[in-house]
């Protein structure tokens, strides 16, 4: 299609929460508090696992990497959301918008792969306990972690490449809280059917495939737990999976509804609500889920606090 007579949009305006203009300052304070607690919580888990030798196991190795990825995942969107809540000019450059989409989706994909790796780790620990030490070696853990990061960073390249070639001649108002594929594609001055299809296929492969692998792992885990004769043994097995399974339900419940759907239209209120869940609430809840439900992490935090003299 000839785009020679069209002027390319240089920046976008992120509308954010247009129906809540009167309470922007309160939203800012609430979001700032959530962001600070998210950063502190995930950073605490990452440092505690790194510093406490008792937590140098495959399960906590993946937990620490997940917490580290959450720091980048939230940094990709929340600081800009905070700035927009205080600013009259809620703009972002075209290249800045694409960078935000890239980092948000690459780190989100990394989280999908890490959650899958954690499910596989729990499957080996519960279903094949005798072979677990020889199967889940430190070398394999490192290789899986590197694979998760490389796969995540490479994931959005095709979609970003395609969207960067689209003409955007106006309007330039993004009806969302941050830059993302669906709301940005809706502003293109040409047919985006190919982009929507590619986005759907990639997200289906990435999100559905990892979710199904996690489900398969948990089906095997449940079958194994049901065969455990003692109630104490069943409780112990379930306790090692409860935190991870809770995170999976919250995270995948929102991203499946948002991204695994073949559509060109965009629903402001519905998609904004989902975006807040998977971009703000899930990273915020993860440290609480992993620490409050995990005695080993709570004990490790106490040991580190005693070591530096905060606790007697």
UniProtKB/Swiss-Prot annotation:
Gene Ontology MF annotations: G protein-coupled receptor activity; olfactory receptor activity
GO cellular component: plasma membrane
Parts of the chain on the Cytoplasmic side: 47-54, 121-139, 218-237, 293-312
Keywords: Cell membrane, Disulfide bond, G-protein coupled receptor, Glycoprotein, Membrane, Olfaction, Receptor, Sensory transduction, Transducer, Transmembrane, Transmembrane helix
InterPro entries: GPCR_Rhodpsn, GPCR_Rhodpsn_7TM, Olfact_rcpt, Olfactory_GPCR1
GO terms, biological process: detection of chemical stimulus involved in sensory perception of smell
Subcellular location: Cell membrane
Highest taxon above the source species: Eukaryota
Residue positions with a glycan: 5
Keyword Protein biosynthesis: no
Disulfide bonds: 97-189
Extracellular side: 1-25, 76-99, 161-197, 259-271
Membrane topology: Multi-pass membrane protein
Transmembrane segments: 26-46, 55-75, 100-120, 140-160, 198-217, 238-258, 272-292
Family classification: Belongs to the G-protein coupled receptor 1 family.
Function: Odorant receptor.
Identification of the protein by name: Olfactory receptor 6N1
């Amino acid at each position: 299609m000839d785009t020679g007579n069209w002027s390319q949009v240089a920046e976008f305006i992120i509308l954010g929460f247009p129906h809540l203009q009167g309470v922007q300052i309160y939203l800012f304070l609430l979001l700032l508090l959530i962001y600070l607690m998210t950063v502190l919580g995930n950073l605490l888990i990452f440092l505690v696992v790194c510093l406490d030798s008792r937590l140098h196991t495959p399960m906590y190795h993946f937990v620490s990497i997940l917490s580290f990825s959450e720091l980048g995942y939230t940094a990709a969107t929340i600081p800009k959301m905070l700035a927009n809540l205080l600013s009259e000019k809620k703009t972002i450059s075209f290249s800045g918008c694409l960078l935000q989409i890239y980092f948000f989706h690459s780190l989100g994909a990394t989280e999908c792969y890490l959650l899958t790796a954690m499910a596989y780790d729990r499957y080996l620990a519960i279903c094949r306990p005798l072979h677990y030490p020889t199967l889940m070696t430190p070398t394999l853990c490192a290789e899986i972690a590197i694979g998760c990061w490389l796969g995540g960073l490479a994931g959005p390249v095709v979609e970003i490449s395609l969207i960067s070639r689209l003409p955007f001649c106006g309007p330039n108002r993004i009806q969302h809280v941050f830059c993302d594929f669906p709301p940005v594609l809706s502003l293109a001055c040409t047919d985006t059917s190919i982009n929507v299809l590619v986005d759907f296929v990639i997200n289906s492969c990435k999100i559905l495939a990892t979710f199904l692998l996690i489900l398969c792992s948990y089906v095997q885990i449940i079958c194994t737990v049901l065969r455990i004769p003692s109630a104490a043994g069943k409780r112990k097995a379930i306790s090692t999976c409860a935190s991870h399974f809770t995170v999976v339900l919250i995270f995948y419940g929102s991203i499946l509804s948002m991204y695994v759907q073949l559509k060109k239209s965009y629903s402001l209120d519905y998609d904004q609500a989902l975006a807040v869940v998977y971009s703000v609430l899930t990273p915020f809840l993860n440290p609480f889920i992993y620490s409050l439900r995990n005695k080993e992490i709570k004990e490790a935090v106490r040991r580190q606090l005693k070591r530096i003299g905060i606790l007697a």
